[in-house]
Structure formats: structure tokens, C-alpha cells
């Protein structure tokens, strides 16, 4: 199989973890006889510094010419004082809008070998395996007006607008139900319908979509209760679907169930089939360039790409199994090591590649005896 992948390293540790993912993808290509072409593009602070904009047109063109997109991370204090249109995060928001990346999938799965790294007791997180489906292109982050100004009395004021079309709600909720059909068959729709008009429409829309999926159970949960339940009883969830800002907050909360943001991959899906994959963690500029960043979320994001965009289920499982084998062997990056000896970014990437090669060799031997 031949595929073109757009690579957007971004800022901070983004280039380091993306390099790790690319190294693993090259190993996959070698072991499974695929050909992956890589084209780099600028985004975020790096794009502001070099091209004067957080999302250059050349980057958008490179993405549209690709079969899938891998992103590192964007942002950092270096650009905090820039005007809003020259903030790194604007590049991420813009690419979501331009490519119509409407649904963000964030799997939350606790690796058995990492249960001790979670801040929660093992009995609370045992068997946790759910996905947060977050709407990406509407809501408070995109609604207009959104501005700061001085009123007639000389006092500073600010306004943001929470705006949604029903069609934007429908498509992401439908995506959640379709996913639930191949999992445990349960969707938890999270809103604030006791206060917000947009949430009342969200809840109504979820009820309507649910009628298309009689084999899937729908439950509604207010966002404040959902935040509590994620800590109190995370094992109850299968698919959580929610609007943009609620999903942004809840997914970061849920990420700590695994013990580190460095373990969580994500996918942003478009209606066109051109999807973007990225680790959940941020750019972590304080550790950039030190070879200590955890690349496993980026590597697992690449595995999601293999499965979702390319239909390469065996290859995706091989990467995930290699990561699991490395963790079971006790290999840890600094964020997971809790003061003990730890692996560097490059060394744990090498461990994953070695486990992938071993797994492939065993598969070849087994095939020879069939």
C-alpha cells in the first residue's frame, strides 16, 4: 500500500514526538511492505516565526494532498503576548475549520502495566476503556461575536457566543452511536440542559438520533456530574459524546486516569475522509529538546491512523501490542517513572521498534508453519 502523510511537527516537544511516530511508521512500512511518503508543513508558533501566520496556505495545500495528517503539538509562552490572530492555537482551530474536522475521538484506556501510575486506586480504574467524542467546529470557540471592548461608561467588557446548528450536533452524535455499535453499545450524552439553550437542543437532537440505533442505549448526564463520575466510577462509560468546550475539559480530566497525558492518542475526523491524528498532550516547552518527552501517545496516534484512515488493522494492532510489550517490560519515560531510572524519547522509541520487529518475526515464523 502506498500512502502520503502530511506531518505537522508544530512547537515544543511536537517535533520530537512526531519524529518518534515517523520512525515507527517506517518500521511498519518495512515489515509489512508498505510505502509511506511524508511531507512536512508548518503550524502554530513555528509557522508564525517562519511564515508570519499560524497556518500558512502551503500547509493547508499539503494536508489536502495527503491521505492523512499527523500533528505534534502547538503553543508555548513565547507567543502569549501576540495578538489573538497570531497565537499558535489559531492554527489548530483554523485547520479544523478548513478541513471540516468535526469530531475528535479520544480513547481512554488504562494499560494494566501502568495502573500504578494513575492517581486513582487500581480498583477504580481496572478495565477502564472508553472514548470521548467531542464536537470540534462549533460552540463557544467559534461563535461570533467574540471580543473585548470598553463600554460607554469606560468599563472593560468581553463577550463570547455559544452557537450551534442542529446539523453540527447531529453528525457528531451519529458518529458516537455508530462507534458504540461496535463496542459495548452505550452512549452517554453530556450537556448542561438545565441551564443552556444550546444544551437543550443538544439533548433533543441526541434523542432523535438514538431512534436510528435501537441496539444502543442512550443516557444523558449533566457536565458537572460527568466531571465527578469520571473520577468516582470511570468504568461505567463506553462512549461519551459532548459539545466542544465540555469535551475539551472532560478529555483532559479523563487523560489523568491513565497516569500521563503522554499516553493518550486522538483522531479528528472529517466528512471527506481526510483525518488528522495527534497526541492529546500539549507542547510542553519546558522539556523541549531534552530527549525526555513521552512519544507513546504520538506513536499510538499513528496506530489510530493506520486503522482508521488506511484500514490496516493488523499493522495498528502490531504497533499497539509493541507499546504494551515495552510497558510490560518495565520501560518508562520520565513522566511515568516516578523518580526511578527512565528511558529517553529516542530509547523508548527504539524499544517499540524492536518489539515490533520481534512480533513481526514471530508472525512470519508462524505463517511458515501454517
UniProtKB/Swiss-Prot annotation:
Enzyme category, top tier: oxidoreductase
Gene Ontology CC: cytosol
Chief location category: cytoplasm
Keyword annotations: Amino-acid biosynthesis, Branched-chain amino acid biosynthesis, Cytoplasm, Leucine biosynthesis, Magnesium, Manganese, Metal-binding, NAD, Oxidoreductase
Cofactor(s) listed in the protein's UniProt record: Mg(2+); Mn(2+)
Subunit structure of this chain's protein: Homodimer.
InterPro entries: IsoCit/isopropylmalate_DH_CS, IsoPropMal-DH-like_dom, Isopropylmalate_DH
Binding site for substrate: 96, 106, 134, 224
GO annotation (BP), single: L-leucine biosynthetic process
Gene Ontology MF terms in the entry: 3-isopropylmalate dehydrogenase activity; magnesium ion binding; NAD binding
Catalytic activity: (2R,3S)-3-isopropylmalate + NAD(+) = 4-methyl-2-oxopentanoate + CO2 + NADH
Annotated TM spans: none
Gene from which this protein is expressed: leuB
Family: Belongs to the isocitrate and isopropylmalate dehydrogenases family. LeuB type 1 subfamily.
The protein's annotated pathway: Amino-acid biosynthesis; L-leucine biosynthesis; L-leucine from 3-methyl-2-oxobutanoate: step 3/4
Annotated Pfam families: Iso_dh
Function according to Swiss-Prot or TrEMBL: Catalyzes the oxidation of 3-carboxy-2-hydroxy-4-methylpentanoate (3-isopropylmalate) to 3-carboxy-4-methyl-2-oxopentanoate. The product decarboxylates to 4-methyl-2 oxopentanoate.
Annotated positions binding Mg(2+): 224, 248, 252
Catalytic activity, EC: 1.1.1.85
Residues at the site labelled Important for catalysis: 141, 192
Protein name: 3-isopropylmalate dehydrogenase
